[in-house]
């Protein structure tokens, strides 16, 4: 939820250093992210923008249509459901009609491989299901920031926008960020400061199959797992629910994006107000001794909304909706004492 353009530094604390400051919460280590602050000088405006492209590259080796048909035939033959069990296994037209011929448009891809009673595997047709589950992902991010100040007052502010189109249809992310920080020194020993980071993001998660009929997984993998010789639409362009009629659990997922919504919204504000007093600027013997009190509130609102229409696989004949909101309010109050002293140029206490 932090704009990368606002990050000044990242520090990892572990072991005693993390528990000394954060107690039990820091037992597994702490990652400190320091955001940018104002610097002395004239006010400067800065813009940073990026555009990136991404693609889904799948190295999984899948069976082609001919290979799949051969394995399905052999499985049926071993169960006594294909050909003549008293003869050696071989392609059989009548067996193919019984096993694969329930849906005419899908069957056409196999039927065309039978010429004059002879099976020609190189003539089997196939359909590229996976092509419907991929697209070129585009991400563009823009940040406008301003910084400046004097030795008495410094300020920094930025506004960021990110939009991402995922490599799968139906997936997207949009985020707005706001970062402000001010630091003032009204009198020499005292420093006052305030920082705030706010973000608002919406994510379209895309389709996730939760029913066992097609197999759980995302949209691309559901499509990529479909039987390669089957087709999603008939010759008139109508949707085919069961492309392989022999198995009613194989359901066509190609239109599922129309029937399902899976959206998350997240709004978050982190703030920090602090005062730091340098005792060394009041009395020379206390040089290096500083006290800091810091208050950090955190507000978060999260919402998950899922809707599955009755016509979809997850809906399974019923309109189903799920709405889960959550709110979080937390704060920390730190009282910190620092002492850093160098003695005889080579010895440092702190």
Segments and roles (model prediction):
Residues 1, 37-169, 207-210, 256-263, ...:
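Residues embedded in well-ordered regular secondary structure
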Residues 1-14:
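Short acidic/polar hinge/loop motifs at secondary-structure boundaries
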Residues 2-5, 23-27, 171-174, 208:
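Short, glycine-/polar-rich solvent-exposed loops and beta-turns at beta-strand/coil boundaries
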Residues 5-7, 26-30, 42-46, 270:
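Extracytoplasmic
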Residues 10-11, 31-33:
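Non-catalytic regulatory/gating segments with a bias toward low-complexity or hydrophobic composition
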Residues 15, 52-56, 162-166, 199-203, ...:
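Structural signature of outer-membrane beta-barrel domains
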Residues 56-58, 120-160, 164-171, 177-250, ...:
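Flexible loop and strand-edge segments within Gram-negative outer membrane beta-barrel domains
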Residues 62-69, 174-177, 209-219, 302-316:
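Flexible, surface-exposed loop regions and adjacent strand-edge segments
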């Amino acid at each position: 939820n932090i704009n990368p353009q606002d990050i000044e530094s990242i520090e990892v604390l572990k072991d005693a250093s993390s528990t000394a400051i954060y107690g039990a919460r820091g037992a597994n280590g702490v990652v400190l992210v320091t955001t940018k602050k104002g610097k002395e000088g004239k006010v400067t405006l800065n813009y940073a923008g990026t555009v990136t492209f991404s693609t889904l590259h799948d190295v999984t080796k899948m069976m082609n249509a001919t290979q799949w048909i051969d394995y399905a035939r052999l499985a049926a033959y071993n169960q006594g459901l294909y050909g003549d069990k008293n003869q050696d296994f071989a392609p059989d037209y009548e067996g193919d009609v019984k096993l694969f011929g329930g849906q005419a448009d899908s069957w056409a891809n196999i039927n065309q491989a039978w010429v004059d009673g002879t099976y020609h595997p190189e003539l089997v047709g196939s359909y590229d299901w996976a092509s419907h589950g991929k697209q070129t992902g585009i991400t563009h991010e823009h940040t406008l920031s301003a910084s400046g100040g004097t030795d008495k007052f410094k300020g920094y502010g930025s506004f960021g926008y990110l939009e991402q189109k995922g490599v799968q249809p139906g997936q997207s992310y949009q985020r707005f960020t706001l970062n402000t920080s001010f630091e003032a020194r009204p009198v020499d020993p005292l420093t006052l400061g305030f920082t705030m980071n706010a973000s608002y993001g919406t994510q379209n998660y895309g389709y996730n199959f939760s029913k066992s009929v097609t197999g759980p997984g995302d949209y691309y993998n559901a499509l990529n797992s479909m039987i390669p010789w089957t087709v999603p639409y008939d010759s008139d362009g109508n949707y085919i629910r069961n492309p392989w009629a022999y198995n009613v659990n194989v359901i066509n997922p190609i239109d599922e994006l129309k029937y399902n919504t899976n959206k998350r919204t997240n709004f978050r504000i982190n703030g920090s107000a602090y005062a730091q007093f340098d005792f060394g600027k009041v009395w020379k013997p206390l040089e290096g001794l500083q006290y800091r009190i810091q208050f950090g509130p955190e507000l978060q609102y999260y919402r998950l909304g899922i809707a599955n229409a009755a016509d979809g696989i997850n809906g399974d004949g019923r309109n189903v909706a799920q709405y889960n909101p959550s709110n979080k309010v937390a704060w920390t109050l730190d009282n910190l004492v620092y002492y850093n002293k160098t003695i005889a140029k080579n010895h440092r206490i702190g």
